[in-house]
C-alpha cells in the first residue's frame, strides 16, 4: 500500500507560529504561507497565527498549539541571519531541535519554515524574490503532511 498526502486544504485547520524578529522578512514569509493555504482551499477562518518575539521561542508555542488537538498542522516561520558572534549557531541548532522534538512528541506535522541565512540578501531572496517564498513552500508541506497522516490513520 502506498500513502501520499494530497494538496487539498479543504477542512484543514492550520496554525502558524511566526517570529517578530526580522519582521521585514518574516512578514513576507507569513504572507506567502497564508496565501498558499487559501489558494489550496484552507478556509481563512481555519488559519490561526501566533506571534513570538524571536525564533528561539517558536518551539514552545508550536508545542502548545500542537498539543491542543485543534490543528492538523503547524507551520513555523522565522529568520535567523548570521552575525559576528556564535549566537546564530546556538539559536539555529536549538530551534531546529525544538521543532523536531515537537513533531516526535505530538504526532502533529510541524513544518520548519525558518530561514537560516548567511546574509540579509539571502533572506530577502528566500522571502519572495529570487529563490521563491519559503513560507509558501512550508504551507504546501503542511497541507501534504496533514493529509498524509490522515490517510495513514484511516
UniProtKB/Swiss-Prot annotation:
Q: Which Gene3D superfamilies match?
A: Lumazine/riboflavin synthase (3.40.50.960)
Q: Name one GO molecular function term.
A: 6,7-dimethyl-8-ribityllumazine synthase activity
**Top-rank EC class of the record's enzyme:** transferase
What the entry lists under Pfam families is as follows: DMRL_synthase
Gene Ontology biological-process annotations: riboflavin biosynthetic process
InterPro entries to which the protein is assigned, alphabetical: LS (IPR034964), LS/RS (IPR002180), LS/RS_sf (IPR036467)
Report the function annotation for this chain.
Catalyzes the formation of 6,7-dimethyl-8-ribityllumazine by condensation of 5-amino-6-(D-ribitylamino)uracil with 3,4-dihydroxy-2-butanone 4-phosphate. This is the penultimate step in the biosynthesis of riboflavin.
HAMAP family the record matches: Lumazine_synth
- UniProt record similarity statement: Belongs to the DMRL synthase family.
User: What NCBIfam families does this protein's entry cite?
Assistant: lumazine-synth (TIGR00114), PRK00061.1-4 (NF000812)
Record protein name field: 6,7-dimethyl-8-ribityllumazine synthase
